[in-house]
């Protein structure tokens, strides 16, 4: 690209391989620039890029680079590539705004999804002005999420070395949680969604608030009711649930073919009723919301929505036995929900838990390690694994897959030290 026109391509390749981040490599290797310390203001940069025809943008970017120092070039590459990200969750950013402004984080979240960037009305309110006058009837409601049950049962330092038997895990459950306080249901292998319908319109949201309705017109067309339902988006295969791979073929599409609509019909397995008509039910206990949901479905019989059944159990041993069959039943595991819990956005501790099936394991050999990208660019964090098999000349290693996630920062540091040793 641009940098390879200014520096030796092989030098750029080697530098990128060492640094691991494209923006950082370009910002550091670009020759000269920014000598007078007068980088162009952001508004001028945006105006220049907007005004430039597509065929001339490379020249405009190069001219901007020449006026910038390494820090400004780094920011510009990140902005242009859409990669200006930091390791901060949206929830944490909203929590910080709440602490700074004194406004409730729950209200900030609700207004957030009813407004559009750059959120001028929201920031005026946070600075002491009037609350934005916005219709939230069709807006996304921040979802309630669950903690892994292991995170609750074990201290953080114990989790990595946790090799307890199922009986020992049940004993911990019994010591910390009363089964009578919880309802259980299957954790379905789909996509968590929120379906909202009012006189104003209809919307289908992902767990992060993204509007995925255009990919599922069959669902939107069937939402002839008013309210807000929380559930799992699934694809039907006759009377059964199709594998997740079938649902993936319908995700992230702006248009859907008639063939997909016919062969991969979508439906929602409902977990919770957040609004019944205009009535907000989120402050009610889960047991009461669940009863309202069951009655709502029985009365209205909404097309493409069914009820996620409760899993009856009389103790942790019985529930552990059910969980052991989750893989054969094509389930991800179980969900545990306190019967007295209100619906609270975010991930409050102690109210909802997910008890996923145990992962399968395989004995593999680490054969390659590669530097990562971004914040992991200084670590060997991308690993290739192989298994032994019988070859023409005896046993041989055959690569079977790569992994670059699923480990903690401490484990990453340990693996990096092992690779470098």
Predicted segments with their positions:
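Short, contiguous acidic/charged loop-to-helix segments that flank catalytic cores in large enzymes
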Residues: 371-376, 400-410
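Conserved, well-structured core segments
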Residues: 269, 333-336, 368, 382-384
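Metal-assisted phosphate- and nucleotidyl-transfer catalytic regions
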Residues: 295-344
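Short glycine-rich loop/turn motifs
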Residues: 181, 191-193, 331, 350-352, ...
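C-terminal structured "cap/appendage" subdomains that terminate the fold
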Residues: 418-421
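Flexible, glycine/threonine-enriched loop-and-boundary segments that flank and lead into catalytic domains
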Residues: 147-182, 316-322, 336-373
